[in-house]
Amino acid sequence: MASNIYHSIGVDIGGTKIAFGVFDIHGNIKDDIHIIPVPFDKKKVADVHRIIDSITPFVENAKKYYPLIAGIGLSICGNVNKENGEATLIPNLHWRYVPIGTMVKDALKLPVFAGTDVRAAIIAERLWGVAKNSRFFLWCTVGTGFGGYLFLDGKLYDGYHGFAGPFGHTIWDEDGFPCGCGQRGCFETFVAGPAIARAGQAAVDAGHSPIMATLSNGERVTTHVVIQAFHQKDPAALSIIEQVARLIAINLSGVVNTLDLEMIIMGGGVIQACPELVERVDHYIRKFLMSEELKRDLKIYKESFINSALYGAAADVFLRSALINDDIGA
């Protein structure tokens, strides 16, 4: 097929890191995935101009090696208007109504297709991953934030405004910790990476984890330190991860019970670093499912790729350019 000669560039802008790479139409990464930190200004706002500058050399080089590039796909960790490429609300980057799609298109002279990272991830899993033959499933990401997206009756479920799926922003405690979205007590403030780090710091402050105290070496405890301690069987870290798994299971069970889903796919930085979390969520969620059929049939998998959102950003280019013929509502 003529479409086989095309490539796309995927760019995944997360809460702390940017990943990018070149893909063929079958989902194969060409060369390596490049990862750089998100540049922030003094006000802790992600600097969109520096982001564009940082990926420009890669894109220009890719044009030389892959002359038929169908476009650039952007996956971004928050609400994105996929029609005009505007990042409407990105709490972890402190963006509101940033026209990043247009800015990247103008700078790099290629078609640009932008969307939320969880939507991109679900596209990758449906086209190239474990959900190829599934019609009712959910993507869940655990990283700097917590979120998800839905695939219902063979279609992406975008919702009325295109923002469906922010499971991390259901309110669990209206007097709880402040969230980047402007609310307090959002679910992600209990289970995402910063919450795991906060729980680890509390354990160290209380003298409950000499291992995490040693690993952090006098600095603030990070999510990475908690997961390191978990893998060293530290009781405090084991308890933190167990509690996170239980809370995620409770949250997702409500979605599964409501929509009668067949599958959950979990990804994100925390899952990549601690894949055991998937098994623990699988263990707990059975207790909260309503029917015996759901308890029997629900499957929970770790994401198929090292970064499904990145793969999905590239896939979205092929879908929206009509180079892949798969009517999933992209």
Label for each model-derived stretch:
Residues 134-191:
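Glycine-rich phosphate-binding loop of actin/hexokinase-like ATP-binding domains
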Residues 36-39, 95, 163-166:
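A short acidic/small-residue loop/turn micro-motif
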Residues 70, 76, 152-153:
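A cytosolic small-molecule/anion-sensing beta-strand core signal
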Residues 1-71, 82-84, 102-110, 127-134, ...:
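ATP-binding/phosphotransfer module of carbohydrate and carboxylate kinases, centering on a glycine-rich
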Residues 112-116:
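General beta-strand structural signal in soluble alpha/beta enzymes
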Residues 85-96:
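A charged helix-plus-loop insertion that forms the helical arch/lid used to bind
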Residues 122:
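Acidic/histidine-rich catalytic cores of soluble enzymes
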